[in-house]
Amino acid sequence: METFFITRKEMASLLLAMKNNRSVLDAMKELWIKRHQGKIREGYSWEAFLSTYLPPIFERIIQMRGTDKGLSLNEIVALGNQIEYTQISATSVQNWVKRDIKDHISTPRIGRKYSVDQAAMLFIVEDLKTTLDFHSIRKLFSFVFNNPNDDSDDLISPVELFELYSTIFEELDKDDNQIMDIGRSEMALMNQDHMLKYVVKRKADEAVARHDLTSEQKMVLSNLISIAV
């Protein structure tokens, strides 16, 4: 039976579709078609895939309508575990919400459920915690997202941030092996480790340059993206 795991960038696309009231089914179909050109040439169709198996969490978000875009913590965990090479535990997420980033994620925004941006924030924590302690994560979140109950003061929304750094990672991981690839021309500049940091930081700087932010804000946001990548 075929499984349907997706990359971080693809997950960001689904979250953006949910947030912007686009059809999640259409967004998911686009991702599936992009990944299965060979099977399509052999006559296998998206409709056939849908009729055989789709993870329950994907069925759930496909069925969301209008203001019903909230996710329980268990649903966020299930969704996060559809990202390639990711294993999020429900216990960890409970600890983040109740203790580690309690003041930054705030309370559920849609009834008893969490918003798409809150879900993205938890996915960002999952990526950052391999490099940073929670004290550092909280400091970055305070600077980038400011008041957790007011989206208007965010330097960038959590979903957009998740999409930004996952896009950079995929650009540098063209063969999808979770190892960033560096061009030979750049390889000559310095040793591999330093050069990798240089390339990631350069791409992060280019990404934040498009946002209307102060120099300090751009610097912090670029550093956060570099760490997440």
Question: Which residues make up each language-model segment?
Answer:
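N-terminal intrinsically disordered, low-complexity, charged/polar
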Residues: 1-47, 203-206, 212-229
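Intrinsically disordered, low-complexity regions
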Residues: 8, 12, 68, 158-162
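Phenylalanine-focused residue identity feature
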Residues: 4-5, 49, 58, 123, ...
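Detector for methionine-enriched segments
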Residues: 1, 11, 18, 28, ...
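Basic helix-turn-helix/winged-helix DNA-binding cores
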Residues: 15-135
